[in-house]
Amino acid sequence: MTTTLRRGETGSLWDRFCDWITSTNNRIYVGWFGVLMIPTLLAATICFVIAFIAAPPVDIDGIREPVSGSLLYGNNIITGAVVPTSNAIGLHFYPIWEALDEWLYNGGPYELIVFHFLIGIFCWLGRQWELSYRLGMRPWICVAYSAPVAAATSVFLIYPIGQGSFSDGMPLGITGTFNFMLVFQAEHNILMHPFHQLGVAGVFGGSLFCAMHGSLVTSSLVRETTETESQNYGYKFGQEQETYSIVAAHGYFGRLIWQYASFNNSRSLHFFLAAWPVVCIWFTALGISTMAFNLNGFNFNQSILDSQGRVVNTWADILNRANLGMEVMHERNAHNFPLDLAAGEVLPIALQSPAING
């Protein structure tokens, strides 16, 4: 006689679904934020791929002069982009059912991609916090991830809101991003904004600190292998002993620069490595969000004059000329002519005609 013991089914279908969603034993953690993250990121990705390949030209300026951005309409991987929603739409919510005939022409895919993408990365951030909570970890992973989330939100949502149209959002492409950067510099002088300068310090400084830390650790590994073996074999996942000598790294760096320029605490060191770029990128996102409402970077529009009233050219004048040139090239239509050019005083080019002696 054979007796079979079967584990009884406990709980309702909903309870089992909840247990599966929040289980940390799954190969990929889903979580409640993942329930919303997965469909939104899938929708954004699918729409982006289709639009990048086959979307028809978009009337970005709202004046019936469409601009093509897809591969099938003459672009390549470098020049291709998902063109932002038309200026004729402004800040209106523009779902596909609002204008089936003109949705593609007015750049509807851009709004669809951006909105779903932003919701998706917000949920990814929440999912990071949720998984950390389930595992009993501290929440600093999602705090660090909030920096790129804030940066993406500032260029895709806050800046268009401040400028009054989603046509001013960053195009979804390589050269589209470069064009956005040039126009941003022309209209807001972002290079002269302290918060952007902090962001540059965060990105380049973070790269420098990462390279310094990695090279110091790699150079001070505790020898566990012979010369003929890879040094990576000297580490076993989960081992208790240190794999490198922080004392040696501290001594080297302290003698190379200055004693107090080197960390002697591994925890404070890694906190600094995380905090430096995160805080600086926070400030950059804040700077873009303020420039969205035209609180721009420093300007040096008043040239230095000598005793005769003549301009003494400085680097600020060169920067101003570059900004005005980029702004004129960007605004392709007379009715959008830059106000800082159209409203300025007329400056004489020459006080008198030169004499021509034949």
Swiss-Prot record:
PANTHER family: PHOTOSYSTEM II D2 PROTEIN (PTHR33149:SF12), PHOTOSYSTEM II PROTEIN D1 (PTHR33149). GO terms for cellular component: photosystem II; plasma membrane-derived thylakoid membrane. Residues 343-358 form a propeptide. Cyanobacteria usually contain more than 2 copies of the psbA gene. The chain crosses the membrane at residues 29-46, 116-131, 140-154, 195-216, 272-286. PROSITE patterns: REACTION_CENTER. This is Photosystem II protein D1. It holds the Pfam family Photo_RC. Chlorophyll a PD1 binds at residue 196. The D1/D2 heterodimer binds P680, chlorophylls that are the primary electron donor of PSII, and subsequent electron acceptors. It shares a non-heme iron and each subunit binds pheophytin, quinone, additional chlorophylls, carotenoids and lipids. D1 provides most of the ligands for the Mn4-Ca-O5 cluster of the oxygen-evolving complex (OEC). There is also a Cl(-1) ion associated with D1 and D2, which is required for oxygen evolution. The PSII complex binds additional chlorophylls, carotenoids and specific lipids. Its EC number is 1.10.3.9. [CaMn4O5] cluster binds at residues 168, 187, 330-331, 340, 342. It is a multi-pass membrane protein. Chlorophyll a ChlzD1 binds at residue 116. Photosystem II (PSII) is a light-driven water:plastoquinone oxidoreductase that uses light energy to abstract electrons from H(2)O, generating O(2) and a proton gradient subsequently used for ATP formation. It consists of a core antenna complex that captures photons, and an electron transfer chain that converts photonic excitation into a charge separation. The D1/D2 (PsbA/PsbD) reaction center heterodimer binds P680, the primary electron donor of PSII as well as several subsequent electron acceptors. Keywords: Calcium, Chlorophyll, Chromophore, Electron transport, Herbicide resistance, Iron, Magnesium, Manganese, Membrane, Metal-binding, Oxidoreductase, Photosynthesis, Photosystem II, Thylakoid, Transmembrane, Transmembrane helix, Transport. The record marks 342-343 as: Cleavage. The record marks 188 as: Stabilizes free radical intermediate. It catalyses: 2 a plastoquinone + 4 hnu + 2 H2O = 2 a plastoquinol + O2. Pheophytin a binds at residue 124. CDD domains: Photosystem-II_D1 (cd09289). PSII is composed of 1 copy each of membrane proteins PsbA, PsbB, PsbC, PsbD, PsbE, PsbF, PsbH, PsbI, PsbJ, PsbK, PsbL, PsbM, PsbT, PsbX, PsbY, PsbZ, Psb30/Ycf12, peripheral proteins PsbO, CyanoQ (PsbQ), PsbU, PsbV and a large number of cofactors. It forms dimeric complexes. A quinone binds at residues 213, 262-263. It comes from Mastigocladus laminosus. Belongs to the reaction center PufL/M/PsbA/D family. One of its GO terms (biological process) is response to herbicide.
